[in-house]
Amino acid sequence: MKKSFAFLFFWVALSSALRASDATRLEFDFAQSDHGFVAGFADYLQISDPSFYELTSSWQARPLNLGGASALFISGFNHSDDLFMYWKKKLTGLPPNTSVVLTMEVQLASQYAEGLVGTGGAPGEDVIVKAGAVPFEPQAVVDPQGEWRMNLDKGNQGQGGANMSVIGDVAKPDDGTNNYAMLLRHQHGKPFTVTTARSG
C-alpha cells in the first residue's frame, strides 16, 4: 500500500512576460483548510466492490513527528501495479486563452526509505510523483475495457505525458525508521506550459 501526505505550491507566469514582477504565485497551506482540492483515482478495473482497492482520501492530521497539523492524505492498494491517485483543484482569475508557464512544487511526506524492495516494485522509488495542468476538468472515465482512465495524457507509470510531467518519487533518505519524513518535489528548470480556458 502506498501512502503519502501532500502539500501543493504553484508558481504561475504568463509566457509572454516572464519577468518575476509579472508572475503570479499561488500557494496552498493545508494546515487550516483543504482549499477545495478534490481527490480521485484511475488506472484500475471498474469492479462491483471498490473496497478491494482500499481507496482512501481525506483532509486529516499529519503524524505527530511532523507536528500534527492537517494535510491532504491519499492512499490505495496497488493491485494492478498501475494505480493512479491524484488531487485536483480549479484555478480561476487567470487571463483567458493565454499560454502560461507553470512551475509547480509539491511538499509531501513519505515513510518509505530508499532501497526498499516490495511486491511489484520499490515502495519508494517506484511510486512516481507527477504534476500538470489542463484547461478542462481532469477526471477518470471508464474505457471500453472496463478500466478507469484519466481524460488527459498523464503518461504511464514512470513516464510523463503531454499534460503532466514527472517531478520525482516518494523515497525518503534511509534513516533506519518507519517515521514519515518531509520531501520536496518540484519542476524547477523544467517549466510546464498550458493554455488557459476561455473563462480564464
Regions from the language model: what does each represent?
Residues 194-200:
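Noncatalytic modules at the cell exterior or secretory-pathway interfaces
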Residues 6-16:
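Bacterial N-terminal signal peptides
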Residues 58-86:
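Surface-exposed, low-complexity/disordered Ser/Thr/Gly/Pro/Asn-rich loops and linkers
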Residues 79-95, 187-189:
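Short beta-strands within extracellular/lumenal beta-sheet-rich domains
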Residues 21-52:
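Extracellular carbohydrate-recognition regions
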